[in-house]
């Protein structure tokens, strides 16, 4: 039985990375405990305000954000923290060598109905040690990530992590309060018959995405010649976890529903860390044309379309978009 601490001692590239990952995952234990208490801890319901994204915050959104922010601010290796919930990045320790970005509680609309939610995190190098970190320091492409992962709070609490060339999973043992290794080399099959998409936005999609979904719905009677099933958790962390466990496709494509937004999901807090996990598990991740991990960010709250999962389906969607005259 291998614990997270034992794994990090042998795999983490530096003591600093080891320590920051430990800080994030320790906070995950606290969030997991709060979620199990639910209404008994008075953490359900609305917080009464909105985040920088214009979304109504849940009480646990705010609490999870504050727990992570406070813990990382006390970590000497962390130079700065950026959260999906806050307008600007928060400087931490000027001598730190790492930057941490996180979505404190992905899928928070699921909290009050007792469905899966999670914490997504990304760790980047900090290049200006000795100086106070700024928003611009976080504007690095996803291919620069030193580590990425998520904590899924479901029937059990699962940590999925990548710090080398592979993806591993740990389960939080409620008896010992340790993360215990359960999967050492997560791999996604190239082919799949499952897809996750919010089909209510169909009329807002570009023609290539409409064509793709039409083909899947036609199933064995259409050009694909086989049937597909829809799965939708309404939390990216839940859908990505299912894909890492048994393959599949997840997409939140470009749409015209909100003309001023390039996509629904955030590049820095969601798309980049999840894309790194998916690619290192032999899957693919694109905005329908470009590799997500190669996108050069211009804002810490930048949004992008996302298509990720089983590689053959991701490649096919990209081909449909590249071959379409109105891309």
Curated annotation (Swiss-Prot):
A Pfam match: FBPase
Catalytic reaction annotation: beta-D-fructose 1,6-bisphosphate + H2O = beta-D-fructose 6-phosphate + phosphate
Subcellular location per the Swiss-Prot or TrEMBL entry: Cytoplasm
Pathway in which the depicted protein is active: Carbohydrate biosynthesis; gluconeogenesis
Gene3D superfamilies found in the cross-reference section: 3.40.190.80, Fructose-1,6-Bisphosphatase, subunit A, domain 1
Keywords recorded for this protein, A-Z: Carbohydrate metabolism, Cytoplasm, Hydrolase, Magnesium, Metal-binding
Enzyme class: hydrolase
Gene Ontology molecular function terms on file: fructose 1,6-bisphosphate 1-phosphatase activity; magnesium ion binding
One GO cellular component term: cytosol
GO biological process, one term: sucrose biosynthetic process
Binding site for substrate: 106-109, 198, 264
Residues bound to Mg(2+) 2: 103, 106, 270
Cofactor list: Mg(2+)
Keyword Magnesium: yes
Predominant localisation class: cytoplasm
Binding positions (Mg(2+) 1): 84, 103, 105
PANTHER family in alphabetical order: FRUCTOSE-1,6-BISPHOSPHATASE-RELATED, SEDOHEPTULOSE-1,7-BISPHOSPHATASE, CHLOROPLASTIC
Record text on subunit structure and interactions: Homotetramer.
Family: Belongs to the FBPase class 1 family.
Protein name: Fructose-1,6-bisphosphatase class 1
């Amino acid at each position: 039985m291998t614990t997270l601490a034992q794994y990090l001692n042998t795999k983490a590239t530096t003591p600093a990375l080891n320590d920051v990952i430990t800080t994030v995952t320790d906070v995950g234990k606290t969030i997991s405990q709060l979620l199990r208490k639910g209404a008994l801890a008075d953490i359900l319901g609305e917080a009464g305000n909105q985040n920088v994204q214009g979304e109504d915050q849940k009480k646990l959104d705010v609490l999870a954000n504050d727990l992570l922010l406070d813990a990382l601010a006390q970590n000497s290796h962390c130079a700065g923290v950026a959260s999906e919930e806050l307008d600007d990045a928060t400087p931490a320790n000027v001598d730190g060598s790492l930057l941490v970005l996180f979505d404190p509680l992905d899928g928070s609309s699921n909290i009050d109905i007792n469905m899966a939610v999670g914490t997504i995190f990304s760790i980047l190098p900090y290049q200006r040690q000795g100086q106070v970190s700024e928003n611009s320091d976080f504007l690095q492409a996803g291919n620069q990530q030193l580590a990425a992962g998520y904590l899924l709070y479901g029937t059990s609490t699962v940590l999925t992590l990548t710090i080398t060339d592979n993806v591993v999973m740990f389960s939080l043992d409620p008896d010992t309060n340790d993360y215990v290794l359960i999967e050492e080399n997560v791999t996604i099959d190239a082919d799949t018959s499952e897809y996750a998409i919010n089909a209510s936005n169909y009329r807002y999609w570009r023609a290539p995405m409409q064509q793709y979904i039409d083909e899947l719905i036609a199933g064995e009677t259409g050009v694909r010649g086989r049937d597909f099933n829809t799965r939708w958790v309404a939390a990216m962390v839940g859908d990505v976890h299912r894909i890492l466990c048994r393959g599949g496709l997840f997409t939140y494509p470009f749409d015209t529903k909100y003309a001023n937004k390039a996509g629904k999901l955030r590049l820095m807090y969601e798309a980049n860390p999840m894309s790194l996990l998916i690619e290192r598990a032999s899957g693919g991740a694109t905005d329908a044309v470009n590799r997500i991990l190669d996108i050069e960010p211009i804002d810490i709250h930048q949004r992008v379309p996302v298509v990720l999962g089983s590689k053959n389906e991701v490649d096919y969607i990209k081909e449909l978009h590249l071959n379409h005259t109105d891309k």
